[in-house]
């Protein structure tokens, strides 16, 4: 999940943490903070980690800040946005896009920002795989 601390979707951290707690025996959630959209992740890595813990009690991994779009896109997100999947490819449109990979690292689903962590479409995709 590409994340940001000052975004309208930031409260999704709460749902992501709940999902992680409920599914952590078979699901790993990893947050990748990025400042690509509206400067909504201006903090340092330490500030981001503190924010996530203090405001949302996040226990899933929060990585160092990355770029998810543009000339300096991180290799992982370059792959995630170009890899063939049943949903769509292309640039990330905003913070909190979600990518579901299987246990072999195959990209199987991608969800736009508006899909909440507790949405049935996301939960069904997790259960199916």
Locate each region found by the language model.
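Thiol-/selenol-based redox modules, centered on thioredoxin-like
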Residues: 75-78, 82-129
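Stable alpha-helical elements in mature extracytoplasmic
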Residues: 12-15, 44, 48, 72-73, ...
């Amino acid at each position: 999940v590409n994340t940001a601390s000052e975004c309208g979707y930031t409260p999704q951290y709460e749902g992501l943490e709940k999902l992680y707690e409920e599914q952590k025996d078979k699901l790993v959630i990893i947050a990748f903070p990025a400042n690509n959209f509206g400067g909504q992740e201006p903090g340092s890595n330490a500030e981001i980690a503190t924010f996530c813990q203090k405001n949302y009690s996040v226990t899933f991994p929060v990585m160092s800040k990355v770029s998810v779009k543009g000339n300096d896109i991180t290799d992982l997100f370059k792959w995630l946005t170009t890899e063939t999947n049943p949903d769509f490819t292309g640039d990330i449109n905003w913070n909190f896009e979600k990518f579901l990979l299987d246990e072999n690292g195959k990209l199987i689903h991608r969800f736009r920002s508006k899909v909440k962590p507790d949405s049935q479409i996301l939960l069904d995709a997790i259960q199916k795989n």
